Design a protein with these regions (language model features):
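C-terminal motif of bacterial Sec signal peptides marking the signal peptidase cleavage site
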Residues: 13-16
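Positively charged n-region of N-terminal signal peptides that target proteins for export
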Residues: 1-5, 18-20
Length: 350
């Protein structure tokens, strides 16, 4: 039976930081747990003047490299009723170690940054089957092909141009990533220039932007203080047959001190508007979709003095469902599908 699979697109434009999780997924080199992520709240102190006004700005300086650990945790539960009943539970944790090297900062504080994803560790399970992959350690060619997207991203530097308010103006110099991906997949000599452009755009959109959007957040141009709010309208996205408009809303909750630095804490939330017809017919199958429900919340710690995110955590929950009906020689066949996904993103400056 043909069945439309519900695909959830991670909402990468919200940031936040929780305060009660700690996990240790893998041991790193020399006994150091490079992949150990910690989402517990930073232990900040009270600032003498928490009501002062300030600017939120990125302040990268040439020669001062920065490393981040970005962790993505996905839990997906799917229930399908058709000829049979099927439940599936998929979990995946991916940890990225990213080096940022400021190459140039111009007079308008636009920074050219060279980024290198040094390594990626993936732990996943689908129902009772588990697997793991760490870039740079596997010698199994079939395993590398299976995880080509991760393998190609690792140790192939690329560049971005970033405004002082966190807007990514350009992503470029991704040729090494594209070429490595095509080589691993065996397409290096078989794709024409047009198809290579398509692959390049897909790598930027699905491989790089989700990670970059966790480290670089759009900040307000105006001066802010405690209780200040600002928002950004995101590009319209398509989920199945629906168009979704999303607005990220931020609010400064406090100004505190961490290791003698002034740190701004701000909450993030998401407002969504979903439009589109709920009914869809494809090759004789009639589908009725419920509009997706999306919620997101969290907190971010931003070092006002150094102009960098210190820590953040994103919690995004998405629920979608649909029913289907089709005619057959034995009468009508009906089915239903529901899917609930929670995605957590943790960013740590290390």
């Amino acid at each position: 039976m043909k069945y439309i699979s519900i695909l959830f697109l991670g909402l990468f434009f919200i940031i936040g930081c929780g305060d009660n999780e700690k996990n240790n997924p893998a041991e790193g080199k020399d006994g150091q747990n490079e992949y150990s992520f910690d989402s517990t709240a930073l232990k900040t102190e009270t600032l003498d003047n928490p009501n002062q006004a300030f600017y939120l700005r990125y302040k990268f300086k040439t020669g001062e490299k920065v490393r981040y650990r970005v962790t993505s945790i996905m839990n997906n539960r799917q229930h399908i009723e058709a000829d049979t009943v099927m439940d599936q539970n998929v979990k995946q944790t991916a940890v990225y170690l990213i080096d940022i090297d400021p190459v140039e900062v111009d007079a308008e504080s636009v920074a050219e940054l060279k980024l290198t994803i040094k390594s990626i560790k993936v732990n996943a399970s689908a129902n009772e089957e588990s697997f793991s992959f760490e870039t740079g350690t596997s010698k199994d060619s079939s395993e590398i092909v299976k995880f080509a997207e991760y393998a190609a991203l690792t140790n192939n530097s690329f560049s971005i141009r970033l405004s002082k308010s966190g807007e990514i103006l350009e992503i470029f110099k991704v040729d090494k990533i594209v070429n490595q991906y095509l080589k691993i997949k065996g397409y290096a000599d078989s794709l024409n220039a047009e198809n290579k452009v398509v692959v390049r755009n897909q790598i930027i959109t699905t491989g790089l932007k989700p990670i970059l959007s966790q480290v670089f957040r759009e900040l307000p141009e105006k001066k802010v203080a405690k209780d200040s709010t600002w928002s950004f309208v995101q590009p319209t996205s398509r989920i199945l047959i629906f168009q979704m408009e999303a607005t990220t809303v931020y609010k400064i909750t406090n100004l505190e001190k961490y290791e003698d630095n002034v740190v701004a804490l701000f909450d993030a939330s998401l407002i969504t508007k979903v439009e589109g017809q709920t009914k869809y017919t494809d090759r004789g199958i009639n589908y009725t979709f419920k509009k997706p429900i999306t919620t997101a919340a969290g907190k971010v710690y931003f070092n006002v003095e150094s102009g960098l995110i210190l820590k953040s955590k994103t919690d995004v929950n998405i629920s979608m469902a649909n029913t289907m009906e089709m005619d057959s020689p034995k009468g009508k066949i009906k089915g239903s599908q529901s899917e609930n996904q929670k995605i957590t993103y943790i960013v740590e400056k290390i």
